[in-house]
UniProtKB/Swiss-Prot annotation:
Any one GO CC term of the record: plasma membrane
HAMAP family found in the cross-reference section: MdoB_OpgB
GO molecular function: phosphatidylglycerol-membrane-oligosaccharide glycerophosphotransferase activity
Signal peptide stretch: none
Membrane topology: Multi-pass membrane protein
EC number(s) stated in the UniProt entry for this protein: 2.7.8.20
Identification of the protein by name: Phosphoglycerol transferase I
Pfam families per the UniProt record, alphabetical: DUF7024, Sulfatase
Swiss-Prot/TrEMBL keywords: Cell inner membrane, Cell membrane, Membrane, Transferase, Transmembrane, Transmembrane helix
Role, per record: Transfers a phosphoglycerol residue from phosphatidylglycerol to the membrane-bound nascent glucan backbones.
Family in the record: Belongs to the OpgB family.
Matching PANTHER family: LIPOTEICHOIC ACID SYNTHASE, PHOSPHOGLYCEROL TRANSFERASE I
Amino acid sequence: MSELLSVALFLASVLVYAWKAGRNTWWFAATLTVLGLFVILNITRYASDYFTGDGINDAVLYTLTNSLTGAGVGKYILPGIGIVLALVGVFGALGWILRRRRHHPHHVGYSLLALLLALGSVDASPAFRQITELVKSQTRDGDPDFAVYYKEPAKTIPNPKLNLVYIYGESLERTYFDNDAFPNLTPELGALKNEGLDFSHTMQLPGTDYTIAGMVASQCGIPLFAPFEGNASASVSSFFPQNICLGDILKNAGYQNYFVQGANLRFAGKDVFLKSHGFDHLYGAEELKTVVTDPSYRNDWGFYDDTVLDEAWKKFEALSRSGQRFSLFTLTVDTHHPDGFISRTCNRKRYDYDSKPNQSFSAVSCSQENIARFINKIKASPWFKDTVIVVSSDHLAMNNTAWKYLNKQDRNNLFFILRGDKPQQETLAVKRNTMDNGATVLDILGGDNFIGLGRSSLSGQSLSEVFLNVKEKVLAMKPDIVRLWNFPKEMKAFTIDQDKNMIAFSGSHFRLPLLLRVSDKRVEPLPESEYSAPLRFQLADFAPRDNFVWVDRCYKMAQLWAPELALSTDWCVSQGQLGGQQTVQHVDKTQWKGKTAFKDTVIDMQRYKGNVDTLKIVDNDIRYKADSFIFNVAGAPEEVKQFSGISRPETWGRWSNAQLGDEVKIEYKAPLPKKFDLVITAKAFGDNANRPIPVRVGNEEQTLVLGHDVSTTTLHFNNPTDASTLVIAPPVPVSTNEGNILGHSPRKLGIGMVEIKVVNAES
């Protein structure tokens, strides 16, 4: 209703001004500005909806002010371009319509009415309400109800008798199990759901709407609100260190806690969270690749669900045979947005909706089959009688190819329980949320019936029942929850540990690299993650007088303030103000100690603008002074005009990537010498090893042969045509996720380049 009202007010404002107001520059500018704000707000809302499926929420607040990288980002480029073009088109059309009757006499009354209608359209829009609530959540000091409802459970379970298997289904919300809406989509897992305790109204709250946030909510009974973006949690050394979570209680009660997933454990700090809260046995992509049958059978995120659940079954069987008390948590990935992935062992590889195949529905149908197969193995085993199986979604599905169909339904998270000791078949329609999951499980295992803000749905009352406005209530508690991190409020002295790649100050530890905004009463950490912008881009958003401490590889800050370190991959510390003075210090000891020293200098806006512009230079446009192309740092030598077909820098160098160009091309600003030696230090990937690799300059071609290990080869070239471009053509680029950023599409690797040097051989 609010959305319809806002649109009606918007159209009324346009019509009144266009047909009645007449000509006046000030009123035209004011009305166009407010109407333009309405357009921007709503396009922002729909763009956010595209990524999250939930409009402008806490999860996208960080992303809206930083670059989006990571999971399948290429699939969002086209929609992003469409949004920008639509915005330009709407503004142009709006200005043209408002000026239609500019030659008519001005009428103050109608101009005022049009402006008031425009302001009303903004105020009534859902986008404005969402942003207003988010801003309030950032500025509140907390909510007195937090102290009333936040409860710390006992740290152990007396006489535990049941093992626990907890399955997180990636985005596998309960809505998919509506057989009337989606016939025969989830028959295997749906049948198991109907055999157990099925909680049909599990809502999603702010701060619980992405994977690591859903895990924190379900185990600690709190949303993931932090002084940084939640998916950047990999940079912290401990995770809600003061909280007692489900894993802590299980460990104290004698459980061995296991976690198995197909993706890298470091992503979003899952390893930090789990290690901080009772899990000693963690298995992700790195740990599984040495034990799975086919290490190359992977999707963009890691190992497929059938592989992961097979490994989970092996763990369950071995642990059950050992007789020790255990919990086994596992997380699937095949249903990850935007499209999902199909395991090769599935019988259900295709699901049609609206008379055409739908990839997301197909991935759901396949994944639920794999989960059901895993559960049925447990049920058929002699150990089921001592086991509780929990199946839940980590969060509601984000914007995938099934999302518009899901939105037509009443959406809820999945949460059901199968008890081997005491079979119960019941659908419970009690209002609840994912923070109640851990407390419900703890209650069944014989512990307390509360964890944090979560309550057992079997014997307690959820916040979703207590508060009609539970989403607003949780947002109001955000400052209270952030305080649970116990983050430092000042930074004076700090220590960098090069062996551990950590920085420590005021009792806190963070992984490197790290950017910090330091004020009198607050230290704001800005880690680098798969979803955040590089730290230099984040620093470019600082105000001229903001104090910063930036710890990163030297070459990343060298182009600004230390050109002599342009090729150094050591750690450096920079501090200062973008509009004032900055220093760069080379970290030259294993345990390097430093102090903050911010000078109260006059702000130079010209210097500030220059620093910001330099920070925003993209990697491929960076240039440094060197007599060779060094591939483990960003950019290229000053002599290089442009290059293509080359992937990002890694610690050792860079791969060629046929996704970025069929050949490696390096174009120099000036013609290459008439006669020169080309010294190439490189290695080959996969089948490119020990095969002839053509290297061309102008009309002349030489052959390069590389092995799997790095070697140096010198090729001799004549260049009578004054060619300026070097071309290397790997013969068989291999599609692989080797060394890939989690969630990115596979690269097509050919050769790995460490250094290329042109040596003039003219006499």
